[in-house]
Curated annotation (Swiss-Prot):
Residues 351-382, 672-691 are annotated as: Disordered. It catalyses: L-seryl-[protein] + ATP = O-phospho-L-seryl-[protein] + ADP + H(+); L-threonyl-[protein] + ATP = O-phospho-L-threonyl-[protein] + ADP + H(+). Keywords: ATP-binding, Cytoplasm, Kinase, Magnesium, Metal-binding, Nucleotide-binding, Phosphoprotein, Serine/threonine-protein kinase, Transferase. The gene is SIK2. Activated by phosphorylation on Thr-181. The keyword Phosphoprotein applies. Phosphorylated at Thr-181 by STK11/LKB1 in complex with STE20-related adapter-alpha (STRADA) pseudo kinase and CAB39. This is Serine/threonine-protein kinase SIK2. It is an enzyme of class 2 (transferase). Disulfide bonds: none annotated. InterPro entries: Kinase-like_dom_sf, Prot_kinase_dom, Protein_kinase_ATP_BS, Ser/Thr_kinase_AS, Ser/Thr_kinase_SIK1/2, SIK, UBA. SUPFAM superfamilies: Protein kinase-like (PK-like). GO terms for cellular component: cytoplasm.
Length: 798
């Protein structure tokens, strides 16, 4: 008996958006990966709301040997129950298709993590290797050999814990009965496999463990080559390089695992007792504790009564569930049991982790506090049951994913069918409601306020949201890779006062139209908090045209793997890949474009632009309250009242000054006196009026420019802006740099009747008025405090 996956009773969210495809009780969300005869989909269980990975296999494309291998993989996964091994939840089979529902690891492969972030520290590698070793030892204790251990098959869950996956090459073994199948990945394969000899399964896995540990610590492969014969020769020789940063204990452990003779190779028990592994004794205790917490050995009759009670409350027959667990049926009953058990563990761990309040966490409700204080055995099922009835948004699946799903597997999923047990109608016999009403899971007002499940929904809408307690270093390429199917990133560029803040802020990534305004508002709010009133928004197309970094070339038609060109086959360090270099090049390119091309020291004006943009609003408010400012006319563009600079931007004024400073590089200097009179005449003011205006204005001294002694400039709060004729005479860039090195800043306490003079060293000087002590005290608080002998001229060195 089969039924169509699309349920007509569930209304579509909109007329334009197609309904989500379903396989049994699972709503298909997106594609995780594709193969020659299989495709892996990300799905969500409709009852437990748990994300799972469904491997959909087209049996018509498999020969009998490969089909036997698939069945053996399912048989192996049914026997394995370990915290660091991917769990099997359900197996569904039709005439042509096979659906394998397994645990979903949210953080992907260890290979991608190393490619993005570089090699691990030895302490972090030790923690990960303990988890890997525990999983492999568990397999060997059940007489199962993996035979394909590599970083691509080591997945990372939401807590960055190891999950061993892909038992496609796994097999059962007996002690003393060697295996002979050539399988696995060549860089991780043992010498006996390259030689075509029979081998012991555990010895093969130990060699692969040595290669995995080397990759974790070094970020590259110990054995590599341009072709298979070269790689084979290097593996048979057993020679590899040890980097300078690897400790001696780690080196000895890897060398004992990578021994060419399998009989002399170290065993798992000896690995656990090695000095490098025992450097942190707490890790071994954590492994034993985490393994003891796995409390479902269902086929042995060890059931979780609390989970069974929750299922019975939901209307699922308890007796049918127990029978499915005893027979290892892995049907809908067993899948709901296993998924509910995982949800219960997550709920308990979240209650424990939410006890220490943080700045981002909201105050828990009284019911949550009471549940957290209760023992685990006495935890009621009402809270978890209500969370299971939380309604998911109907617009979870993007139209592009739906279109992609329509063409997968040469239409084996059109329409998608799933098998149903003949006695399935007794599943909800203890409930007065219909199955469709249970699947629709109506929302109650109490459940709407469950913050944990709201966070879970937000985590799905933004799958790469980085928690604050993690140490992962996500690059811009990784962000772009995960969102190539959604809206392009909106990158906000602002004038920051601190150079350490970088040039670009975090990307405002939106995955749906409902969240776009919220994400954009939060990003802009973050810019306002940094004190940047003027921000320049740049689209992804502009970034792609301005930056040479290939990582910014967003290609929506390509998958995530296309943006990770670096592989261990190329023999490069993961930390030295183009991902990190691309991000650095992007920031350097933006800084380079923001700099002025010309005289030495012109780039210092960028610091002035940032300082003006950051503190203009606060300084204007303080200047408006100053009695000195009230007594002055609004005649300059930097006046606090802003009457003469309406419609003009501060940043534009600074850029205008940059252009003025680069004019007339070939003219000779003229005498100081004619230039002074010309300056006053050009401004339309007589010399006396010019001097009087300068006396009445205050100035802003940039201490940063004075310290560098490269470009001295004094701007008054109400002083006149330097005009282009100020720079009518100049010298070449080379000669100006030479004069700059010999120039001494000239500050005099004498009051000068003119506004600008020229020194005899061919350096341009702008003269500012003197101030008395009372006026200086009431001036701008950001003005540098000058002593009595420093009041007077301000020299502009060019």
């Amino acid at each position: 008996m089969v039924i169509m996956s699309e349920d007509a009773s569930v209304p579509a969210p909109s007329a334009a958006q197609p309904r989500p495809l379903r396989v049994g009780f699972y709503d298909i969300e997106r594609t995780l990966g594709k193969g020659n005869f299989a495709v892996v989909k990300l799905a969500r269980h409709r009852v437990t709301k748990t994300q799972v990975a469904i491997k959909i296999i087209d049996k018509t494309r498999l020969d009998p040997s490969n089909l036997e291998k698939i069945y053996r993989e399912v048989q192996i996964m049914k026997l394995l129950n370990h915290p660091h091994i991917i769990k099997l939840y359900q197996v569904m089979e039709t005439k042509d298709m096979l659906y394998i529902v397994t645990e979903f690891a949210k953080n992907g492969e260890m290979f991608d993590h190393l490619t993005s972030n570089g090699h691990l520290s030895e302490s972090e590698a030790r923690k990960k290797f303990w988890q890997i070793l525990s999983a492999v030892e568990y397999c060997h204790s059940h007489h199962i050999v993996h035979r394909d251990l590599k970083t691509e098959n080591l997945l990372l869950d939401a807590n960055m814990n190891i999950k061993l996956a892909d038992f496609g090459f796994g097999n059962f073994y007996k002690s003393g009965e060697p295996l002979s199948t050539w399988c696995g990945s060549p860089p991780y394969a043992a010498p006996e496999v390259f030689e075509g000899k029979e081998y012991e399964g555990p010895h093969l896995d130990i060699w692969s463990l040595g290669v995995v540990l080397y990759v974790l610590v070094c970020g590259s492969l110990p054995f590599d080559g341009p072709n298979l014969p070269t790689l084979r020769q290097r593996v048979l020789e057993g020679r590899f390089r040890i980097p300078y940063f690897m400790s001696e204990d780690c080196e000895t452990l890897i060398r004992r695992m990578l021994v060419v003779d399998p009989t002399k190779r170290i065993t798992i028990s000896q690995i656990k007792q090695h000095k490098w592994m025992q450097a942190d004794p707490s890790l071994r205790q954590q492994q034993s504790l985490s393994f003891s917490m796995q409390n479902y050995n269902s086929n042995l009759g060890d059931y979780n009564e609390q989970v069974l009670g929750i299922m019975q409350t939901l209307g699922i027959d308890r007796q049918r569930t127990v029978e499915s667990l005893q027979n290892s049926s892995y049907n809908h009953f067993a899948a709901i049991y296993y998924l509910l058990l995982e949800r219960l563990k997550e709920y308990r761990s979240s209650q424990l982790s939410s006890r220490p309040a943080t700045g981002r966490q909201q105050r828990p409700r009284s019911s949550e506090i009471s549940n957290a204080e209760m023992p685990q055995d006495s935890l009621t099922s009402e809270t978890l049951r209500s969370s299971l009835l939380y309604q998911q948004p109907q617009s979870l699946i993007q139209p592009s994913l739906q279109a992609e799903m329509d063409c997968d597997m040469n239409n084996p999923l059109q329409p998608v069918f799933f098998p149903v047990d003949p006695n399935f109608n007794g599943l909800f016999r203890n409930r007065s409601i219909s199955p469709s009403s249970l699947l629709e899971t109506t929302i109650s007002e109490e459940v709407r306020q469950e913050k944990e499940l709201e966070d879970e929904i937000k985590a799905y809408d933004h799958p790469i949201r980085i928690p604050s307690n993690t140490s992962r270093r996500h690059t811009l390429a990784e962000v772009t890779t995960h969102f190539y199917q959604h809206a392009p990133p909106c990158i906000v560029i602002s004038s920051s006062a601190s150079p350490t803040e970088g040039t670009s802020s975090d990307s405002c990534l939106t995955s749906s139209s409902n969240d776009s305004s919220v994400a954009l508002s939060s990003c802009l709010a973050g810019q306002v908090m940094t004190g940047s009133p003027a921000t320049a928004r740049m689209t992804s197309a502009f970034l792609a045209s301005q930056s040479d970094a290939p990582v910014l070339q967003v290609q929506g038609c390509m998958g995530g793997a296309s943006l990770l060109p670096v592989s261990f086959q190329e023999g490069r360090r993961a930390s030295d890949t183009s991902l990190t270099q691309g991000l650095k090049a992007f920031r350097q390119q933006l800084r380079k474009n923001a700099r002025a091309k010309g005289f030495l020291g012109l780039n210092k004006i960028k610091g002035f632009a940032r300082q003006v943009c950051q503190s203009s609003s606060s300084r204007a408010a303080r200047s408006a309250m100053s009695p000195f400012q009230h007594a002055q006319p609004n005649t300059c563009i930097y006046s606090s009242s802003g009457s003469s600079r309406e419609g003009r931007n501060l940043l534009e004024e600074v850029l205008q000054q940059q252009r003025m400073l680069q004019l007339q590089h070939h003219q000779l200097l003229q005498p100081a006196c004619p230039q002074t009179s010309q300056t006053s005449a050009t401004n339309g003011l007589p010399p006396s009026d010019s001097a009087g205006t300068c006396k009445a204005s205050n100035s802003l001294l940039l201490s940063e420019l004075q310290r560098e002694n490269s470009f001295e400039l004094a701007f008054g709060g109400n002083s006149q802006l330097l005009q282009p004729h100020f720079f009518g005479v100049s010298v070449s860039p080379v000669s100006s740099a030479a004069h700059l090195l010999d120039t001494h800043l000239y500050i005099s306490s004498n009051v000068s009747p003119v506004g600008t003079t020229f020194s005899q060293q061919q350096s341009f000087s702008a003269q500012s008025p003197s101030y008395d002590a009372v006026t200086l005290q009431h001036g701008d608080c950001e003005m540098e405090d000058l002593t009595s002998n420093q009041l007077g001229k301000f020299v502009l060195v060019k």
